[in-house]
């Protein structure tokens, strides 16, 4: 984000002496994107931020994927993936991979326990809070998050998730191999959100703090690139990473609640790009929120049938009643995967039922990817095998 923030104790000039009350020096760390050519922040640590005293492999949950072959639309019931074990599960180690490709991985987790300290060395994360409450503690400070929040965590940000509600924390995790930003068309050339953007800087919540935590020989989990894909390392650092007395800059984690998204509507059906909220390399994130729908006298409010020949479409249904999917078995916590090369659209009867409807009370998060998605173990474990045949009245192989 080009939106500048300052928190805690920073010196008047960057790259100059910043002394402790005892006369020692704080250690300055520049955290920046694209080398030294994009957004960055300067953090001032009590300890040396590069110090480690141990490093060993961290065994990640399964990252294996299976091609979508034969090519069919799929329905994944994510709420089936977790039972009572959620109480001892955390948002980092408990993620189950649902879908992925070389640009983005989508996981789901239901958690009740605090995570270990963690940073993603591959790319930014966008975690959508389907339900529950948590505090996200980071080197930049803390964020209190709740249902409907998108939490954007920049690459290499050390943080941990601490559930704070009485019930489970349900998190839909989008992990990029790139940065996740507002769409370029929403931004001025200096990075300000423009008048036509469906949200603005006032809607974004930054960290508060700073956090100052004492500790010695603290473990930090790091997800990073390996020869055969995504791997993990467990560092032990000599002092707690939450030792930042102050920072300033334009790179930091932030939260944005889906209820603050202002939907763009029209007389006839508007295409998915008007619902876009973020973008990464070779994928976009959109949301479909409660809204007034098409008001042309002959409009058909549900989507027309379409073939997205260049992308796979993933819809995560997280609230309301999704009109176009009535009769498909899809409900809250469902994912639909409609792959490129396959025509998709409303279920039978939805076209006709939508005529005259003036308002859609629906909430869904969509990820469109420009490379084919494969199924992770969480995807294969939660699949509804009958979904592909629902446009044909249930007629399918062996039926």
Regions found by a protein language model. Give the residues of each.
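Jelly-roll (double-stranded beta-helix
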Residues: 1-399
